[in-house]
Design a protein with these regions (language model features):
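A positional/architectural concept
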Residues: 1-53
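Charge/polar-rich, low-complexity and marginally structured segments
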Residues: 49, 55-163
């Protein structure tokens, strides 16, 4: 159970547990978004594992980054990029988000090396995932967004090197 004042991820958005309400036999977290003003959420405690998770520890982040090398990535059907990407993003699982980002990073790098432009729909998802992960890394590791971006880029580079 999370505690009042704790920073958590709700659908991979940073939020603070502002209150734990007990009413009519049910218990719910009242969350305040740390990313947008006047945005709050109510999450039943019994429902918390669906969309609510702890901020990842440094050890968890390192493990996720190390696992990138053996992660096969996500197969993206070129005629259904939105559908493929949304299916991965909806469960709000960091490991799957990193797996998709790895695939998009490989596609982006290949396009750049071939002198092509990165497909617009993939570029959009690459930006969304990168921004979200940089925000999470910055909060979890108490570092600047620039440091988090460099760390993420280094992990992607290392995770896509052929062994």
């Amino acid at each position: 159970m999370f505690q009042t004042g704790e920073i958590v991820l709700y659908r991979l958005i940073l939020a603070r547990v502002s209150e734990i309400q007990k009413e009519n036999g049910s218990v719910r977290y009242l969350l305040t978004s740390l990313e947008s003003d006047d945005c709050s959420y109510e999450v039943p405690v019994e429902n918390r594992l669906g969309h609510l998770q702890a901020l990842p520890s440094e050890a968890k982040i390192r493990t996720l980054f190390q696992d990138l090398a053996s992660d096969p990535g996500v197969r993206i059907a070129r005629n259904a990029v939105d559908r493929c990407c949304k299916a991965v993003l909806e469960p709000y699982a960091l490991k799957q988000w990193l797996s998709l980002l790895k695939t998009l990073y490989i596609d982006k790098t290949a396009a750049e090396m071939a002198g092509r432009t990165f497909v617009e729909s993939e570029k959009r998802y690459y930006g969304i995932i990168t921004e979200r992960l940089i925000t999470i890394l910055s909060a979890a590791l108490d570092q600047s967004p620039k440091q988090s971006e460099a760390m993420l880029n280094a992990a992607l580079e290392a995770g896509t090197q052929e062994g």
